[in-house]
Amino acid sequence: MEKQVDILIIGAGISGIGLAVHLSKKCPQRKFEILERRDSFGGTWDLFRYPGIRSDSDMSTFGFNFKPWAKDKVLASGAEIKGYLSDVISENQLKDKIHFGHRVLSANYDSTKKKWLVEIEDNNKKKQIWSANFVMGCT
């Protein structure tokens, strides 16, 4: 099955989620989807869960301009950042745009079609080819 999108975002961490929000607000006519290899969003903030993990950057600069950090503590823990990203996903209706358990096997530009052809494998080992005008690596 081939799925077609304008923009394919690879990665549902802070960069991929931020890009998705900006696209939905500034380019609502563009169709985009997010591929995430793991079973959850958050990237680093989901992957690493050791005691004491936190951002070394204050959240007033690390957070998004469209959703200012509202807590008093400016150096957020990993769990707090993951919660912040969860709020961003909910508030911007991004949940249905994220495809968890989808791994990119290859991405090749077809100059005849003027499209990226991206081979994807899901957790069930089912392979698909998606086409996109743009592929944004947010990993």
Model regions and ranges:
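Active-site acidic short loop of glycosyltransferases
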Residues: 2-5, 131-133
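N-terminal Rossmann-like FAD-binding beta1-loop-alpha1 element of flavoenzymes
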Residues: 3-34
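Short, solvent-exposed loop/turn segments at secondary-structure junctions
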Residues: 15, 39-40, 105
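Carboxylate/His-rich catalytic cores and anion/metal-binding grooves
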Residues: 34-43, 131, 137-139
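Glycine-rich active-site loop/strand segments that organize a redox cofactor
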Residues: 37-87
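Feature captures the FAD/FMN-dependent oxidoreductase FAD-binding
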Residues: 71-139
